[in-house]
Amino acid sequence: QLAAPSPFAPEPPAPPAERRTNEAPAGTPGEEPKKRRRSVLAGPEYSALNDGSESDSNLLDPIANNPYSSLRDRSIEFVFKFLQAIANDEVISLDEAEDIVYDCIEEPEAMEHLYTLAVSVIDTSNSMAIHLFNHMVYSLKLGQGLKWPEDRLIRLGVASLIHDVGMCGISQHIRHKEGKLTSEEIAEIRVHPQYGMEIILHMFGDQFQWLAEAIYHEHERENGRGYPQGLSGGEISEYAKIIGLADV
């Protein structure tokens, strides 16, 4: 059983955004070797990009015909890896998630293409992973609209991509129930931010308190009528405020 986390400390200042060189696979955004920054999340310098290839389809397919569809595929694949790591009680690096978010914001036109993917009607067989990809896109668009700097956008994107991991602790019956939930089921659903926070701190420790806090505060609201703590205004993580707005 995961240990109860200690109270959150203030978010540490982000390190300078240095670049590191990675060569992306052919056919994906950023084909030219490019300078990449040292992780703004935590830990040592991150490793190279994973391959994410696009599948062939007819030109009417809004996914296959989108030049950034590989980012959607990589996002979904990462979510699956993260959920599997939780199931196996393993630690997974966030390097791949950081690379995905960086590629989303690196080129000015990328976000419009990604938004097209997010609003497309897609099969629901991978509904949670697709929801998290869509949520990341919406969150990043909001962050860009607020003129957030690159380091904050990367943290925002990573947090939004995994913000619902606490749902793993909710019974499948409730998660997949059609129709109205009972008051007891609603109460169980409302525990998932706590589960998510515990998962992050268990995996990554206090160095990632900012991420645990973003996930824990996602359902808090400015007027204090959210949950689980009823926080308001400045008590709520700035990342969580954006994540909450984008959660559709």
What does each of the following model-derived ranges do?
Residues 160, 201-240:
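Histidine/acidic-rich helix-loop-helix segments that form or flank divalent-metal centers
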